[in-house]
């Protein structure tokens, strides 16, 4: 059953006599759901929430692979995926070269309506024949989800522009078409640091990318882990040893090696750690989340028997 509504509707649903709540959304709402669930003895939760995911690029990888993978990871779906790489960590020996080329590639991305329409008098709104919608390949990504999300992206972009410690490589342009809100990419260079402006550690959820240098593998691990989130990280290196170390030390629920993003593999669990959530709502883990185990002992003897040591 689908029940549509906003906050009040959702709050009523989670207070019903249900055994398990599976939620995908913001960390703030997820935290509220877990508090409500804690008031019950039996209610459990699986929450997949926000992230500050990253792509980590070592200097032994091909530049073309690094660019292709990081562009896709950062800007697919307007950067509005929980696994989008809002941070790109690059080894210092290739940092300047990569940043320049990344900004150039990002500047070529077109944003706009993701569909083409066959207009006609079909009785549909605005005369659009919905069955004839086809992807518009000219545009790499579409709009920000709504005005609230659009204003959030603009807010963080403006913080970056006002910060003397951030070097802006590509400034965004904005446009509004009815209820569609568009932003071109924001790309900037900065050292990892304590930043009270929030844009380095908070989830922006839009085409907003910080390119951050690191020197050693230990630096990369420290920088990646230095947020409240722990959802996804991409490792780009030709060195299997480095990849395994990163896999073991990065605080993330999903790690991909030499790819553009997490693959939609039905047999793999999808979820994170820390503020990114609890539980992995996919694959076999889903069934374990919404069921409970029962220990069933069967006596096949003709008389009553007891476990060893019990009389």
Regions found by a protein language model. Give the residues of each.
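A structured beta-alpha segment of the ubiquitous adenosine-cofactor-binding alpha/beta core
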Residues: 1-20
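Conserved residues at the C-terminal ends of beta-strands
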Residues: 5-6, 24, 237, 258
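Conserved C-terminal structural/oligomerization subdomain of aldehyde/semialdehyde dehydrogenase
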Residues: 56, 123-124, 133-134, 175, ...
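Buried hydrophobic positions in well-ordered alpha/beta secondary-structure cores of metabolic enzymes
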Residues: 20-21, 51, 91, 102, ...
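Short helix-initiation/N-cap motifs at beta->coil->alpha
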Residues: 6-9, 51, 215-217
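Short, well-ordered alpha-helical microsegments
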Residues: 10, 30-31, 243
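ALDH superfamily catalytic-core signature
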Residues: 17-20, 28-194, 257, 305-306
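Short catalytic-loop micro-motif centered on adjacent basic/acidic residues
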Residues: 1, 20-23, 56, 232-234
């Amino acid at each position: 059953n689908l029940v549509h509504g906003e906050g009040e509707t959702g709050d009523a649903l989670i207070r019903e006599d249900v055994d398990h709540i599976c939620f995908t959304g913001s960390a703030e709402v997820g935290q509220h759901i877990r508090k409500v669930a804690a008031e019950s003895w039996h209610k459990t939760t699986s929450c997949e929430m926000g992230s500050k995911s990253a792509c980590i690029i070592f200097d032994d990888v091909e530049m073309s692979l690094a660019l292709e993978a990081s562009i896709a990871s950062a800007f697919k779906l307007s950067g509005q995926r929980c696994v989008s790489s809002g941070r790109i960590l690059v080894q210092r020996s290739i940092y300047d070269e990569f940043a320049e080329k990344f900004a150039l590639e990002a500047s070529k991305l077109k944003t706009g309506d993701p569909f083409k329409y066959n207009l006609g008098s079909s009785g549909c709104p605005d005369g659009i024949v919905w069955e004839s919608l086809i992807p518009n390949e000219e545009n790499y990504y579409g709009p920000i989800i709504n005005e609230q999300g659009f204003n959030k992206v603009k807010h963080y972009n403006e913080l970056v522009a006002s910060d003397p410690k951030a070097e802006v490589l590509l400034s965004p342009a904005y446009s509004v078409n009815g209820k569609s809100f568009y932003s071109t990419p924001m790309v900037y260079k900065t050292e990892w640091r304590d930043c009270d402006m929030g844009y380095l550690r908070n989830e922006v959820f839009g085409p907003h990318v910080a390119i951050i240098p690191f020197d050693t593998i230990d630096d990369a691990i420290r920088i990646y882990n230095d947020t409240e989130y722990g959802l996804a990280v991409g490792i780009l290196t030709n060195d299997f040893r480095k990849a395994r170390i990163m896999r073991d030390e990065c605080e993330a629920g999903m790690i991909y090696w030499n790819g553009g993003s997490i693959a939609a593999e039905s047999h793999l669990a999808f979820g994170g750690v820390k503020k990114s959530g609890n539980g992995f709502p996919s694959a076999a883990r889903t069934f374990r989340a919404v069921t409970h185990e029962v220990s069933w002992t069967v006596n096949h003897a003709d008389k009553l028997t007891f476990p060893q040591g019990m009389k």
